[in-house]
Amino acid sequence: DGIWTQLIFTLVKNLATLWQSGDFQFLDHECHYRIKPTFRRLKWKYKGKFWCPSWTSITGRATKSSRSGAVEHSVRNFVGQAKSSGLITQRQAEQFISQYN
């Protein structure tokens, strides 16, 4: 499970420099990232979304109290779904991580 955690944190580290939305190359696919602030029960929340429409219909989503938490958990949600469906192999994860470390 360590490689998947490393993959998530490598993606998050790269997406954290983007503010509310942006595009990101992930495993040779163009992916998109968006964070939207919302006000819920008298508190600010952030809705995160990570998706790669030219590659898969999988969408990672999360709502958290911090912007960074929304980024992390939407990526975590995407990677979990992609791993479960066999879309991302361990070798691909290792290669992606090695590009950024």
Swiss-Prot record:
The keyword Disulfide bond applies. GO terms for biological process: defense response to bacterium. InterPro entries: Anti-LPS_factor/Scygonadin, Anti-LPS_factor/Scygonadin_sf. The keyword Manganese does not apply. Disulfide bonds join C31-C52. Keywords: Antibiotic, Antimicrobial, Disulfide bond. Signal peptide: none annotated. Binds tightly to LPS and thus specifically inhibits the LPS-mediated activation of the hemolymph coagulation. It has a strong antibacterial effect especially on the growth of Gram-negative bacteria. This is Anti-lipopolysaccharide factor. It comes from Limulus polyphemus.
